[in-house]
Amino acid sequence: MPNSINIPLFDNDERSIIGTIYKKEGRKKAVIEGLKFFENKMELLLDNLFMSIDSYETNPKKNNEFFIKIYCSRGGMRSQSIAWLLEKYKLNPITLKGGYKIYRKWVLDSFSKKMNIVVISGKTGTGKTRLLSLLEKYKYQTIDLEGFACHRGSTFGGLGMKKQPSNEQFENIIAEKLKLFKCSNDIFVEAESANIGKCKIPHEFFNQMKNSRRIEILRSESNRLDELINTYSVFKKEELQESVLRIKKRLGPQRTKIALESINNEKWDLVCRSVLDYYDKCYEFEKVGKTNIKLLDLTDKKYDESILELINNVL
């Protein structure tokens, strides 16, 4: 679960021992053995918990009332025993009934709810991510799928990003953000393929994206080149060249050679031009069959508050 702290009660060997005792000698003896292991770790566990509590207490954004939310796999003895222990220390534990299993059901169910999704689409370099950030800044409901996936979606998408979350974590993060929204209001997302790097967009959510209203951002080639240069010229040459080589079969030998040499010589406009045609063709292919598209020309426009009125006019 997002922002949770993992405090294992048992390691793999201990779990195996407890499981074996449970099968051969029954639940009672397995519980006793588990308590022996737990007793040896109680001090360390409490230290970790109190460190987290101290960190929260010094947070200026804290709520007045403090509860410790505890969960385990199915809401059984592990979470219940920790809750009992915390009660002895006059703390306020809350256990998640049904545990993480129930939480995951809630996560997956949340993607099936009917949502008013608005997809921001456009060719590479039209500033879709910056536009989404602008909408977020002005309190529009937005889901930053690339931000949550720690990947921009292209062969260059992992540059400068943190390690990608697991697909399960990715789904949990999206669901937690959706929980804050009114589904009857517009929810803005950037157009994506089904996979963002190694993260897969939840199937039900992606289906809603495919059938949603779309705003296609139009910008001049000059604007798009500037956008790409500002985004990618800051990275190491070796990283950029590795990214180009991953799509060399699609670029072809001539464009691959131009891109690699241009990176080496820091001719960023040539680098971007050499890959732009490839990504434009990919975009046109993905656009086939899409309907309900409104065009929004932002050529030479500053991405500031003045754009919001233009967006509202095309909705």
PLM feature segments, named:
Residues 1-56:
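Positively charged, proline/Ser/Thr-rich regional signature most characteristic
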Residues 2-4, 115, 209-213:
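Short glycine-/polar-rich loops that comprise or flank the Walker A/P-loop
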Residues 36-96:
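Catalytic cysteine-centered active loop of the rhodanese-like fold, especially the PTP/DSP P-loop
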Residues 61-64, 109-116:
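Phosphate-binding P-loop
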Residues 76-80, 118-137:
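Glycine-rich phosphate-binding P-loop
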Residues 87-104, 144-149:
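A short glycine-rich beta-strand->turn/loop micro-motif centered on a GG-aromatic cluster
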Residues 137-207:
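Conserved nucleotide-sensing/catalytic segment adjacent to the nucleotide-binding pocket
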Residues 208-214, 218-315:
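Conserved NTP phosphate-binding and transfer environment spanning the P-loop NTPase/kinase superfamily
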